[in-house]
Amino acid sequence: MEKELIFGHRNPDTDAIGTAIAYSYFQNQHGYNTEAVALGEANDETSFALKKFGFEAPRVVKTVANEVKAIMLVDHNEPQQSVEDRDQVKVTHVIDHHRISNFATIDPLFYRAEPVGCTSTVLWEMFKEQNMEIPANIAGIMLSAIISDTLLLKSPTTTDIDKEAVEELAKIAGVDYKEYGLELLKAGTNIAAKSVEELIDLDAKSFELGSKTARIAQVNVVDVPEALERKDAFLAAMEKDAKANGYDLFMLVITNVLDSDSEVLFIGDDESKSVFAKAFGKELVDSEAHLPGVVSRKKQIVPPLTRAFEA
């Protein structure tokens, strides 16, 4: 069987990399010939999880058509979040938990998406449906993905299925998920050593919102005031990146993983700022707004913005 590559979105997080690894194992057990790769380097949080459960970071690829004819996607489907030459290969499988947007294929494919907190939760269901045993290290990396995406089950994206998956995967992996989860999240909050340019690209995704192209980046911290000491530098870097890449607006969501609130920095024209205010009921003051209880880009940021821009 010809080889297929499995990967998550650009600027990969723990779900994108962890689920790619786990899905590659799953598919190889079913006779496929797959390799998990990544569209960017593993971040600090993901590196912590990989080391904890004995995995090497997947190799990074910029293109895929030079290697394979077919690919499998996890944790994304939108083309602007995927590999740049995706239109030159066949997508055979997708496992996701996001909205479906700008996605089309010539041939039928396997597509499974559910409104749960993490793609690894969907994969956990697939393991159970087929009565497949999950190795301890695979369980550990899937557990890490769910903890990361749901902020240790505190995110509003969290479902009962996510909670059940975490309980079961933690037992298989042999860890206390609450203790390990806090260690994992804290591993991803050390932003002091990174430049503002790195931080606004670390976990950033592009979205089509009505007629606007938006870039929405997110960083997790335990000290928001410390992060905001670099506010002017963040805004300057966002402005530069928006102009260079043709983004109509750029949002940086600084999320406190301990109290589940976010501070937003925003670059955009007056129309976009007005739509932001309409979407969240908050006026931007000096390009900044406080969004209490908002932690999920997928569920709490993109949907209200989409509705507001399309109204």
Swiss-Prot record:
What's this protein's family per the entry? Answer: Belongs to the PPase class C family.
Please give the organism.
Answer: Lactobacillus delbrueckii subsp. bulgaricus (strain ATCC 11842 / DSM 20081 / BCRC 10696 / JCM 1002 / NBRC 13953 / NCIMB 11778 / NCTC 12712 / WDCM 00102 / Lb 14)
Requisite cofactors? Mn(2+)
Q: Which gene encodes it?
A: ppaC
Binding annotation for Mn(2+) 2: D15, D75, H97, D149
The UniProt entry, under HAMAP family, shows: PPase_C (MF_00207)
Q: Which reaction does it catalyse?
A: diphosphate + H2O = 2 phosphate + H(+)
According to the UniProt entry, what is the EC number of this protein? 3.6.1.1
Keywords assigned: Cytoplasm, Hydrolase, Manganese, Metal-binding
The name on file for this protein is Probable manganese-dependent inorganic pyrophosphatase
- Kindly list the GO molecular function terms attached to this UniProt entry: inorganic diphosphate phosphatase activity; manganese ion binding
| GO CC annotation | cytoplasm
What's the top EC group for this one?
A: hydrolase
Q: Where in the cell is it found?
A: Cytoplasm
Report the domain of life of the source organism. Answer: Bacteria
Q: What is its main location?
A: cytoplasm
Q: Which PANTHER family match?
A: BIFUNCTIONAL OLIGORIBONUCLEASE AND PAP PHOSPHATASE NRNA
Q: Which SUPFAM superfamilies match?
A: DHH phosphoesterases
Q: Where does Mn(2+) 1 bind?
A: H9, D13, D75
